[in-house]
Swiss-Prot record:
Gene3D superfamilies according to UniProt: Urease accessory protein UreF
Domain of life: Bacteria
Protein name: Urease accessory protein UreF
GO molecular function, one term: nickel cation binding
GO cellular component, one term: cytoplasm
Listed Pfam families: UreF
InterPro entries (alphabetical): UreF (IPR002639), UreF_sf (IPR038277)
Species, as recorded: Rhizobium etli (strain ATCC 51251 / DSM 11541 / JCM 21823 / NBRC 15573 / CFN 42)
Assigned protein family: Belongs to the UreF family.
Subunit structure and binding partners: UreD, UreF and UreG form a complex that acts as a GTP-hydrolysis-dependent molecular chaperone, activating the urease apoprotein by helping to assemble the nickel containing metallocenter of UreC. The UreE protein probably delivers the nickel.
Length: 223
């Protein structure tokens, strides 16, 4: 990739996965709010552990694998439809399904500012990692770069949620992000070489928290 293309890729990833991109990710905690209410996440250290575990072994890892496969299949409408259906099926709760589908829909709507035929190949309703992977692949951005920024965006949003929930301050939140850098980079490299055989998670408490959040009466977040 030429220097100009490298800069273009960086700018597009920064735009697409920025908190300012209009997809509404700030409204979701992915079960973190319930984990805080249940005393599973109480401070910056446990917040970092929660985020890191999901990235390495939970739903975020599965999202990274799905993103990679979508990136590979971006030129094939049937292949995208198949992986999109799998992504929906892997959503472990009603709120998790709602989150990934609404984020995916909003991402595709906003990303049309960068026209490409990939939008016609994707299903009308598409899970978030499928949308990101296909669009990035269609624009010639390498999977490892996409994954690194995608995972960092997740971590940043989760830290922001933790700050809003009162388990960490802003200074602690920045330290959490800094501490996760090595894991994010390693997971991006691992996911870039993954296949669907690598799907799987071992984060039962996080899955239960996502389910329990559905009946939580007082809340800040939609998931």
């Amino acid at each position: 990739m030429s220097e100009d293309r490298e800069l273009q890729a960086l700018l597009r990833l920064t735009a697409w996965l920025s908190p300012a991109f209009p997809i509404g990710s700030f409204a979701y905690s992915g079960g973190l709010e319930r984990a805080v209410a249940d005393g599973l996440v109480t401070d910056a250290a446990s917040l970092a552990n929660w985020i890191g575990t999901l990235i390495g072994h939970g739903s975020v890892w599965n999202d990274a694998v799905l993103l990679t496969e979508s990136h590979r299949r971006q030129a094939e409408a049937p292949g995208l439809a198949e992986i999109a259906a799998l992504a929906e099926a892997l959503a472990g709760s009603r709120e998790r399904h709602q989150e990934t589908m609404l984020l995916g829909e909003a991402f595709l709507l906003a990303a049309r500012a960068w026209p490409d035929e990939v939008f016609e190949r994707l299903p009308g309703k598409t899970a978030y990692p499928i949308a990101v992977g296909a669009v990035a692949g269609a624009h010639g951005i390498g999977p490892e770069k996409v994954l690194a920024v995608f995972l960092h965006a997740y971590a940043s949003q989760a830290v922001s949620s933790g700050i809003r929930l009162g388990v960490a301050g802003q200074k602690d939140g920045v330290a959490v992000l800094a501490g996760l850098e090595e894991q994010i980079a390693g997971t991006a490299r691992r996911a870039a070489a993954s296949t669907l055989d690598d799907l799987g998670s071992a984060t039962v408490q996080a899955d239960i928290a996502s389910l329990r959040h559905e009946t939580q009466t007082t809340r800040l977040f939609r998931s």
